[in-house]
């Protein structure tokens, strides 16, 4: 079982762009970050820090293009600022709502949490990756974004909005509401 522990933060913008950043504090690859970017035309781009991580993520999820680029990050308790050669972005979130039981079985995540995750956030906590592996998203804390700003190639993307339409990177999209989620991804 491979476990990735970190934070996924996401939202859409008036431009139609949707951005997801994963900041992984612990993983089989050590600490790293990746960006999933859905353009208004539906094109899906993965920005990864190196080819090994890019190939691994691409084996799990669907992308039209993989870019290898430095992802520069500054983070505090409730804010992330990051940039690549194309993207500049800042996410800020508010109160974090914790899940009361941290160590819960994966069967619970794939049944009870799956039901409530879909009902409330329109997201799935369990499914199969592109290459057929089983994956669980174990949410530890969730919070609504209170501000987000982004530029692509120097052009502002406008006001932050819900993550819509779905990007279909994998079996689940992030919450439809602009959100930051402390999460553990288990991949079998």
Question: Where are the language model's segments positioned?
Answer:
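Short amphipathic beta-strand/extended segments with alternating polar/hydrophobic composition
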Residues: 19-23, 44-52, 88-96
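Short amphipathic beta-strand and strand-loop transition segments with alternating hydrophobic
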Residues: 21-23, 69-73
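Acidic, aromatic-enriched beta-alpha/helix-loop junctions
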Residues: 31-71
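Hydrophobic transmembrane alpha-helix bundles
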Residues: 59-61, 85-89
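Generic recognition of long tandem-repeat/solenoid scaffolds
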Residues: 76-85
């Amino acid at each position: 079982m491979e476990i990735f522990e970190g934070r996924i933060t996401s939202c859409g913008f008036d431009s139609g762009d949707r951005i997801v950043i994963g900041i992984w504090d612990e993983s089989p690859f050590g600490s790293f970050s990746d960006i999933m970017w859905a353009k208004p035309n539906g094109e899906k781009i993965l920005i990864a820090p190196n080819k090994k991580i890019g190939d691994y993520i691409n084996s799990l999820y669907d992308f039209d293009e993989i870019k290898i680029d430095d992802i520069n990050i500054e983070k505090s308790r409730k804010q992330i600022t990051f940039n690549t050669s194309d993207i500049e972005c800042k996410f800020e979130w508010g109160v974090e709502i914790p899940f009361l039981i941290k160590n819960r079985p994966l069967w619970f995540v794939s049944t009870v949490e799956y039901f409530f995750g879909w009902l409330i956030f329109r997201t799935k906590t369990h499914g199969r990756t592109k290459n057929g592996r089983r994956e669980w998203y174990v949410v530890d804390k969730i919070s609504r974004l209170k501000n987000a700003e982004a530029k692509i190639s120097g052009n502002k993307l406008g006001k932050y909005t819900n993550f819509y339409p779905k990007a279909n990177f994998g079996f689940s999209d992030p919450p439809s509401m602009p959100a930051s989620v402390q999460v553990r991804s288990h991949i079998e």
